[in-house]
Regions:
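A short, charge-rich alpha-helical start-of-domain segment used by transcription regulators
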Residues: 17-40
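Short, Lys/Arg-enriched C-terminal cap helix and immediately downstream tail that follows
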Residues: 94, 143, 178-187
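Structural recognition of an alpha-helix C-terminal capping motif at a helix-to-coil junction
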Residues: 55-62, 75-87
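Helix-turn-helix DNA-binding motif, specifically the short coil turn and the N-cap/start of the second
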Residues: 49, 155, 164-169
């Protein structure tokens, strides 16, 4: 069966999930749709090099495929796959017995700087190396919400769904993440 990649833009995630359950070839459309954003999320969350990030992404897509039948269509599909991606990435980091490697794309730092009032206040003290160190010195719980909100541009509800935390907790964690980032930068 030939699948037209152009169909990818026309079909909703839920339609593609349903079609993938009936014909595994349609999973290619789902994986094509989410490959770039998930790869970027894994890299931002973990700090792994490109090759290791690709490996984690492949494992994530296998998990998504194997668990596709357990997806609840009442939930947002992107939240569901980001949750799987998040859990698997954190599990991989624990297996490696390491904290994330200090990798952040300089463009991400510019994006954070331009979207954070806290960072705008300390913009003159912020250079790229300092920002990398500051972000990776945060506890995982703060770094996770910061990456999802600022770099992945997720709404609070979607972050809550991905992290399986109440929306109030997400808001508190994000607020604390920016405060801690500010404290580190000011030092």
């Amino acid at each position: 069966m030939h699948i037209d990649i152009k169909d990818n833009k026309k079909l909703s995630d839920k339609d593609l999930v349903k079609m993938s359950l009936e014909n595994k070839d349609y999973f290619l459309l789902l994986s094509t749709r989410y490959e770039t954003p998930l790869l970027r999320y894994i890299k931002r969350l973990s700090g792994l090099n490109h090759e290791d990030t690709q490996d984690v992404l492949q494992e994530v897509f296998i998990k998504i495929y194997l668990n596709l039948s357990s997806y609840n269509p009442k939930l947002k599909f992107s939240s569901w796959i980001y949750r799987i991606t998040h859990n698997h990435t954190m599990s991989e980091l624990r297996k490696r017995h390491s904290r994330p490697i200090n990798y952040i794309d300089p463009q991400d730092l510019v994006f954070i700087k331009s979207n954070s009032d806290v960072l705008k206040e300390t913009d003159n003290k912020l250079d790229l190396e300092q920002a990398k160190k500051a972000i990776y010195s945060l506890k995982d719980k703060y770094k996770e919400v910061l990456v999802l909100r600022v770099l992945e541009e997720k709404e609070y509800q979607e972050i809550a769904d991905i992290l399986k935390k109440p929306i109030g907790t997400v808001s508190t964690l994000l607020n604390r993440a920016f405060k801690k980032l500010n404290e580190i930068i000011i030092k």
